Amino acid sequence: MTITYEWRGEFANQAVNALHAEGFEHPHLEIDWHTQVYRHSLGWVCARSGDSLVGFVNVAWDGGVHAFILDTMVSGAARHRGIGTGLIAAAVEHAGAAGCEWLHVDFEDHLTAFYFQACGFTATNAGLIALPDGRGPGAH
């Protein structure tokens, strides 16, 4: 299987929605990924095998020197072939080329080896507030 990686590549919402549902184990949703990434992201990486989208990662940013890895996903049939690390490597390259100095990621425990050993991230102290209603503490 030959994989190609494309920064800010074209994609169909349906293809990313299918990858997301499979990768994050939830029902298929109709998310408008085009609007989301064009409005809020530095870029994204598409991984393809021929014409098929087999991987995707979103790179959000603060408009300055911080970028954020979101929604790394690889189709089940294409996993354990280095595609995820290829997605992250392309994200690192293009975020750096855009002038970002820091690339952040958060992830579930079972992905620690992937992000730390395979992709080269290091552990940091970070904080998190759960926003169950989307409004946060002190919202009126």
Protein language model features and the residues they cover:
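Short amphipathic alpha-helix that is part of the acyltransferase structural core
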Residues: 1-31, 46, 137-140
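Small/polar loops that bind or transfer phosphate-bearing groups
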Residues: 8, 70, 106-107
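A conserved beta-strand-loop-helix scaffold within acyl/acetyltransferase catalytic domains
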Residues: 32-50, 55-73
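Conserved acetyl-CoA-binding loop-helix of GNAT-fold acetyltransferases
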Residues: 80-93
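Conserved active-site alpha-helix within GNAT-family acetyltransferase domains
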Residues: 97, 101, 108-133
